[in-house]
Amino acid sequence: MDACVEPSSRHSRLDRFASFISLQINKGPNPLFTGIIEELGRVHSVEQRGENARIVIEAHIVIEGTNHGDSISVNGVCLTALDIQRDSFAADVSKETLLRSTLGSLKAGTTVNLERSVTPATRLGGHIVQGHVDARGQLLGVEDHGESWTVRIGFPKEIARYLVFKGSVAVEGISLTIAGLTDEYFEVAIIPKTWEVTNLSTLKVGDAVNLEVDVIAKYVERLLEMSDKL
């Protein structure tokens, strides 16, 4: 192949990839999050409604500026805020979400990570998080280093291809960077601030956690699958 043609072709594919990503991220009303937890909420009640459930969560910060129907991430799951009160909000959780995520194990008193969806003025401090759980992982271990913690999370094989060393992953809705990776687990380094303002410190070895891989990895995979059509 002509060496002068190859770079041009490569740049063309990169340009199409950038346009594709931009289109996907901005194409609809789907809410987005950054993985920067704003507040630790507390589950007030869980009411079973057939195969679904309604949860009421005590909160303060995420209620500010939130209207009926707005989206709030609860442990990394995008939920619609309903019945907003001065110090709480409710949300309905579908059967599928109860089965796919850890929300099915919530009970009164459980601490949860909360984040409002982004606005045009929001700073993207973490990475793009959709609030769509890809899999449930398991907390395998926590190493306390005094001023930091190393958390080890086991994950199912179906999401392994989306995880890369130094890449992003959302754990319980928290934007984290993969500091260590094997075929069966990854490790993340936790700073004191994150330990303080999230539910990680309340989890025990063996607990299930919600995992969401970086959506950009999914778009790359899809682009490669559809490359002949773009």
Name what the model sees in each region.
Residues 25-230:
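Conserved loop->alpha-helix
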Residues 18:
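Short polybasic linear motifs
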